[in-house]
Amino acid sequence: MALLSRRLLAFFVLLSCVSTAIVAQTPPTTRPATRTAAADPNSGPSDVAAPKMGARGQIDAGFNAAHLKFIARGKAGPIGVLFLGDSITQFWTRAQAVFDAHYAKYQPANFGISGDKTQHVLWRIDNGELDGIHPRVVVLLIGTNNFRDPEEAIYRGDKKIIDEIHQKLPDSKLIIMGIFPRGDGRTNALLDSRYPDGPHIIDGRVKLQAVNTQLAKLDDGGKTRYLDIWDKLLDSNGMLTTDIMADYLHPTTKGYEIWADAMQPMLDQMMAPWPATATTTAPAN
């Protein structure tokens, strides 16, 4: 009897060891969560219309409010010159005296939204911002917020916007602004993988200039014009200065004066004859 008990005990000990080994070698069905970077909700294709999204997956409230405001502005009265773009356009409000001095006579409207990429402007166009309006001239400046996209993608986004403007506003003329320089040199470093000997660190402004080279080819000398003020915004050493762009991205009042002065001859020519046959007092922005 004692012998049988010892044998049973040995059997159960062996069975326990085997079970433990099996469990140890079997991967758990639930693995520990791994940390991943949160996906940018606004990193979609530059030429596919998309609203600006908030962090919680909803349309950004400020973006939507501005969009609805612009639609209401279009219904409020005639627009002679329409400015369309991102924060650089929106922040004409920081140089309102310059804006009014140059454009008040042309019944202007400012449809700029801070942070907009090309895909966001496409969504705005597709959702009614250009419906029912007939501006004499549209001034388009967009693309700097697509800074980290490939240059070909930035151009495709701009080109699609340009095509849609012409489709929606067949009688309007268009001034395509070249994307402005940005950064102090150190903040523009990008990893470019196109080199055969491996990735190179490049100045991202080179990419923006390549986009501008493509945009310039769309100038037909008549209905569609291209204006590049890149060099006018830089000093003699090819650098941005804080009196022109305090944050190396958004123009100061002096920067907006440079833009306005450079564009005025082209705009006056494209707006002529002015005033239009039917004019109605309307809000400037």
Which residue ranges define each predicted feature?
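N-terminal secretory targeting modules
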Residues: 1-17, 21-84, 88-101, 269-285
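Acidic/histidine-rich helix-loop elements
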Residues: 45-58, 110-120, 148, 248
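Extracellular/periplasmic catalytic domains that process cell-envelope and extracellular macromolecules
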Residues: 74-78, 101-104, 131-134, 167-169, ...
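Extracytoplasmic/secreted proteins, especially bacterial periplasmic and envelope-associated proteins
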Residues: 79, 83, 116, 120, ...
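Structural recognition of the beta-strand scaffold that forms the well-ordered cores
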Residues: 80-85, 107-112, 136-142, 173-178, ...
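Short, glycine/acidic-enriched loop or turn micro-motifs at the edges of active sites
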Residues: 89, 115, 231
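Oxyanion-hole/transition-state-stabilizing segment in secreted/luminal serine hydrolases
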Residues: 90-104, 118-171, 175-190, 194-196
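Catalytic His-Asp segment of secreted/periplasmic serine-dependent ester chemistry enzymes
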Residues: 183-285
